[in-house]
Amino acid sequence: MPHNNYLYQTRDIKFQIKEWLDINKILSLDAYKDYYGADDFDAICDVNFKICRDVICPANKESDEIGMKHVGGNEKAVISPDVFKTVYNTVIEAGMGPQFGDRQVEGRMPLYWYAPILEMQTGASPAMVMLWCLTQGATTVLQYNLSKELQERFLPKMYSGEWGGSMCLTEPGAGSEVGAVSTKCFPTDTPGLWKVKGQKCFITTGDWDGVDNIIHLVLAKDPDAKPGTAGISCLVVPKFWVNEDGSMGAWNDVTTTGIEHKLGIHGSATCSLAFGENDNCYGWMIGDGPVDGRGQGMAQMFQMMNEERINTGIFSLGAFGAAYYAALEYSKARVQSKKSTDPKGPSVRIIEHEDVRRMLLLQKSVMEACRALLYSSYYYIDMSKEAATEEEREYAEDMFMIQNPLCKAYVSDMAWVMCAEAIQVHGGYGFMEEYAPASLARDCKIYTLWEGTNFIQSQDFTGRKFTMKKGEPFKKWLAEIGDFIANKKTPEFAAEFAMMEKAFAAFNSIIDMNAAWTTTNKQLKQLFATRIMHAAARVICGKLMLDQGLLAAGKLAELGDSHFDANFYKGKLASVKFYVMNVVPEIFGTEEAMKAADTSAIDCPEEAIM
């Protein structure tokens, strides 16, 4: 059956949130200091775990096998099994849903605590988490760009979960090329109110019957706007009109024309939407309307996109983390074949075989490395919004912006690979839908595709992120890695630091070649963008893992081998060593390939690619 047995573990989550990242620094900020202590995270994490184990994960079978159904009509065009509403309402009532989007309310939780909550929820059901997560992202745009009056009209019921939210960018003829959108908006006699007409597709949770209304953020163009992305505006378009007092009015001519039949995440409705088929669809312009043909839509939408990109990394981590824990449990139970060191002995559990150990340590170490990258990046988001000084906020914002493409693309690329490793651990049974990794692999593939394909992330990283603010933030990010490698060496990790020194030198060589190609060979720059992005992720993850290793080594020395937590720290040391000595060295292959500068992929005639 599809994944519906919750095996997720929280010990490394708590280690990274409470022991590794400076939780006291976050909790000393004005937004949090009167409301939370470090131990509160344990309670929140444990409540979320129980919801995931007892409510969300058991419903994943129906999510995968039944999913959403399109029945048409203007009221409830997309219906779901009753258990979906139970899951949704449980999450909302526990405060583990779109409430995190409200960054102005007193007593709000630290934002970086949202990362593990979302990870664990995705590990329970990659599809069902979409029911509330997209709403939280939509509220980010609205609370920072709408007038106070319109915020009061829309946001309370979005935060409460009564209404959902969606992001409407993609059209049949405008996918990655967002500037090609054809949806139009036309001014009316009411200031700020525009008529909307057009079609959108691939809209996650664009409709479903668990909420009373869907508030769509729609990219559209004034017919007189400039071509491309410069002319795009963003409008808030409710499925049902929202009156001045916040009550729900008449249908707003937003039609769900169908839902997609997908490889995975069947429990998430991916909708096709038509706006204004009856010439009666209206929306409020977010911010100002186009000025001299230039809209504000892309800048506004990127506030949500940046958040959804790191969240895609979190989704990816949760999905392949669940696959890893399933593989780990299976490997401890499945008896098959004799040990290589005892060929005449009895058959043993497969966890005792060397190659299974390799696959498990690969999954464990990549999971923990990706978690470090994601949690540290969420920590930067928190600091960028809540730190006391402008200097601290700007630094944190810069570091997050540099790492965000890695959070989205590297982690989602690894999710597909690690789910395949989890399948492999299961042997032939891994190919059967009765075992969890099969559905998790189907579910996780979307993460490399949405919120900007991973090649787009690599272009962003090797282009804008290298050069933003005249390249100073990237230089600082790079210098911090170099300083750590140079100054944190210990005898216990001598081999690992030596490996990181070589890898860091190789990465600097990669950066130099990328910079040269910017002016001399733009096609080579494109050919290697994904590999450069992966190299950067391995460098920063190697640094973060070694930092955790230093902490774990100290803890283990302090506690001793007989302590109940000793095995956790021993496992952490093994993860650190495995990642640095087995995953980081893939950088060298990228460096050598770039030196060779092979252009066969470009030079081969299209007719010869057969």
From Swiss-Prot:
Required cofactor(s): FAD
Gene Ontology cellular component terms for the protein in this record: cytoplasm
GO terms for biological process, alphabetical: butyrate metabolic process
InterPro entries: Acyl-CoA_dh-like_C_dom, Acyl-CoA_Oxase/DH_mid-dom, AcylCo_DH-like_C, AcylCo_DH/oxidase_C, AcylCoA_DH/oxidase_NM_dom_sf, Diverse_Acyl-CoA_DH
Induction description: Expressed during syntrophic growth with butyrate (at protein level). Seems to be constitutively expressed.
Entry-linked Pfam families: Acyl-CoA_dh_1, Acyl-CoA_dh_C, Acyl-CoA_dh_M
Active site positions: 451
Known role: Involved in syntrophic growth of S.wolfei with butyrate, as part of the butyrate oxidation pathway. Catalyzes the oxidation of butanoyl-CoA to crotonyl-CoA. Probably passes the electrons released by this reaction on to electron-transfer flavoproteins (EtfAB) to finally generate hydrogen and/or formate.
Family: Belongs to the acyl-CoA dehydrogenase family.
Protein name: Butyryl-CoA dehydrogenase Swol_2052
Source taxonomy: Bacteria, Bacillati, Bacillota, Clostridia, Eubacteriales
